[in-house]
Amino acid sequence: MANPWWTNQSGLAGMVDHSVSSGHHQNHHHQSLLTKGDLGIAMNQSQDNDQDEEDDPREGAVEVVNRRPRGRPPGSKNKPKAPIFVTRDSPNALRSHVLEISDGSDVADTIAHFSRRRQRGVCVLSGTGSVANVTLRQAAAPGGVVSLQGRFEILSLTGAFLPGPSPPGSTGLTVYLAGVQGQVVGGSVVGPLLAIGSVMVIAATFSNATYERLPMEEEEDGGGSRQIHGGGDSPPRIGSNLPDLSGMAGPGYNMPPHLIPNGAGQLGHEPYTWVHARPPY
């Protein structure tokens, strides 16, 4: 006998559909796997974001950057050079001197002897001290020469001395003196100039001298002047380069025969040759 329809419905209600339940279980398992995967990706992204935040400098933080120092590294270039020692003076150099002339000595004669002994020209720049018994040449004085007795203070002392042959007027001293009563006299020293106490003289010496006559002739403008270099290992002899001037005299200069060049009647560019001895150190 056939079952009524409600029997079938009740039977269906009590039955469990295994296919539906298994499908639901598979879907739940798949969703749980997706959830775990999403969670892992989210965790990885959060860790990456944390690392990025740690790498980025925060506000107020000091960023230290290792930079190369400017300039060359030490020892690469510009190394210290060995010092240069000059063991020989230049022949054209001037040498400064402070000369102390002792009491009772003739100032002019002492400086002239110093020039001949060292074989160097001496240029007197200044002097201080007291002198006595002075003989000066003055144009206004009777006979051109005046002798002064007593003590005088040196106001100015200048001049030059050459060790070798030289024209008149190129060597000597010019002095200005102050007397005890305040009078001032001066002129070229032509006699003794005796030192009272110590007389200090500031001078410069040189080893080369070239004689020039001015104004220069037109044909001499491009020739230049000759010069003798002293102080070498084999210095020239005195008078070796001076021409023979016999029978020629300059009326305006009253030059000795050995200083008039080549018998031409005019003075050219003539050097003075001195034997330069090495001075003691």
From Swiss-Prot:
GO terms for molecular function: minor groove of adenine-thymine-rich DNA binding. PROSITE patterns: PPC. Residues 91-229 form the PPC domain. GO terms for biological process: defense response to bacterium; innate immune response; negative regulation of defense response to bacterium; negative regulation of innate immune response; regulation of photoperiodism, flowering. The keyword Lyase does not apply. Gene3D superfamilies: Hypothetical protein, similar to alpha- acetolactate decarboxylase, domain 2. The keyword Nucleus applies. Residues 43-85, 216-247 are annotated as: Disordered. It comes from the Eukaryota. Residues 67-79 bind DNA. It is found in: Nucleus. GO terms for cellular component: nucleus. Transmembrane segments: none annotated. It holds the Pfam family PCC. Keywords: DNA-binding, Immunity, Innate immunity, Nucleus, Plant defense, Transcription, Transcription regulation. Transcription factor that specifically binds AT-rich DNA sequences related to the nuclear matrix attachment regions (MARs). Negatively regulates plant innate immunity (PTI) to pathogens through the down-regulation of the PAMP-triggered NHO1 and FRK1 expression. PANTHER family: AT-HOOK MOTIF NUCLEAR-LOCALIZED PROTEIN 15 (PTHR31100), AT-HOOK MOTIF NUCLEAR-LOCALIZED PROTEIN 20 (PTHR31100:SF3). Overexpression of AHL20 results in a decreased expression of NHO1 and FRK1 and in an enhanced susceptibility to virulent strain DC3000. The PPC domain mediates interactions between AHL proteins. This is AT-hook motif nuclear-localized protein 20. The gene is AHL20.
